[in-house]
Amino acid sequence: MEESNPQFANALRRIMMSEIPILAIEYVDFSMNNSVLYNELIAHRLGLVPLVFDNKKFHFKDKHDKGKTCSMCEVVFAINKKGSGIVYTKDMKSSNPDVKPLYDNIPIVELFDNQKLKLEASASLGIGKDHARCQAAIASYRYFPTVKLSGKLANVDEVVKICPKHAIKIDGNKVDVDMNCDLCKECVRKADPEGSLEIVGDSTRFIFNVESISGLKPEEIVFQAVDILKKKVKDFGKEVKKIK
């Protein structure tokens, strides 16, 4: 991201982590469970299973009267399995063919002989600000590295070699640093003469790292975060006009 500032970058980061709507299991109704794990622990595991879904086809439950739901705000998963064997996410049967666990091989619980797990779990939209099961991603950012060279380095090879990220390249009086640079400044400390090389972070350019921990792709999370931030700015502008 370029031509911006830390305040804007941090607002975007916070939205990615806490305000992107995610479909996650909220309630679990157990009909039978005599496994080694008690109901609450299995329910907790199910709540953290990432689900693939189309966010355009779902809305929040609060659009309905309390206690009422529809196929666009709730998806029901059923598990009915007998031991012995391991219950995986592939054993979760969905009421909506377009909604399923992101991975089929996530273990839920191991069943031994004469043990059975039968349940229904309902998934609905939520955001990370309200519950950890609905967090879309882990997002962070850092400044884009910029380099300044004053004078000629006496130990070019040593400076290039000491970089742990292999991110610096020097060709005569030209120095290039790629995005892998984490501003550790090992090259700066090694530079001879002292002070001839300087690497700083550009506070108007940012490198984002977005790791999805949900059924959404990182690019989907970024685009949704931008849309949400735009809406917040627009709503804020309306409130300011009311003051006038």
Language-model features and meaning:
Residues 1-244:
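Protein-protein interaction/assembly regions in multi-subunit complexes
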